């Protein structure tokens, strides 16, 4: 496509570059073409991507190159340095670089000056102190060619760019450490350590990265069918309301001992409240189910969708995945439901293939954390969000699994929200393309500066 040719023309003269292309605009194909054009100058390709995408990337390489299956080696959990076959393409899970020393060491043994390194979904290395970021940046330092790619390079602020650009080259931004970068571009809260309140000199950063970045939005380069939205509401049961209020009171009791809340505290509060409106509560390590109406509402929505349509159901919690899958199988049969979640890659890949190719597999039940990045699910034009992420970026990523190149029909997204609950705050934040956690934390900070006693009212209003 024209925009892919533009990307190649811009980045081919440089040894390092970034494809900041919207989801569904063909980043993977563009990256593969860049590799092919440099194949005489490199000995191998190390392609790092989310674990859930490894099989997708393998299929794309087979589709768009002359490589055979033997030319591609996909790292697994048990891959070790002394058992890596010779290959041209190596596909490695990003999560494994931080979670498995064995895999990290095995990957490290493959880096040399003639290696082309691709980091697919480079938002995974935006944390400058994260183990995977530090390892990959160090490993790739001597590699001649480096490419990063993501549709969401910035989710929190310009600080997200630092580590991604440093991976390519510290010379791009001109700072040898995050602290020198922060001193010139970030303003921190005077009392809340680490809380960024303002960014400065953004034009300087934009100018520094411009020669190395190709950026395009879906609206600029594609004519895709429209997105359609629908919302279905429901109320809590009495048991849910009782647990919901109890969870808020337990959280507030902490104020008696510690008036300072961290982002983790607020995350735990939001997670507890959201889990309750999803029908369970992990209270002090004890899991208990609670009667609820969310699953009933889901089944009502499914009944309204034409029988021949495939449907993606996005859930957030493993409890919900099990409950949804059980209910759908009971009504539509065991073969009708595929699940995409958990750590078993082979199982995930098999389930995904079944959803894509088996006409009798109507549902794909997946978590946004596992399936929300990189997958192509254009077989479905209906997606139901059983429970939403707190972040707009996660929601957008999940939406664009169905709404991308290859989709020829309008895609309908149906959200399930519980009235008079945390769901309403999440819905409001997502409508504003924001972060529900960050928005609540800002409210807490404002209240604390005026009247700390109002914090209780703020929490009880959730």
Model-derived segments and spans:
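Conserved pre-motif I regulatory segment
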Residues: 1-20
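Conserved Helicase C-terminal RecA-like lobe
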Residues: 13-16, 25-26, 30-43, 223-245, ...
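Conserved Walker A/P-loop ATP-binding site and its immediately adjacent core
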Residues: 30, 42-63, 155-160, 316-318
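Conserved P-loop NTPase motor "coupling/switch" region that bridges the ATPase
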Residues: 43-44, 63, 85-86, 116, ...
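Conserved helix-turn-beta segment of the N-terminal RecA-like "Helicase ATP-binding" lobe
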Residues: 53-77, 168-172, 331-334
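Conserved helicase motor
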Residues: 73-80, 93-99, 126-129, 315-319, ...
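SF2 helicase motor core recognition
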Residues: 98-100, 156-158, 321-325, 348-352, ...
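A conserved SF2-helicase RecA2
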Residues: 390-462
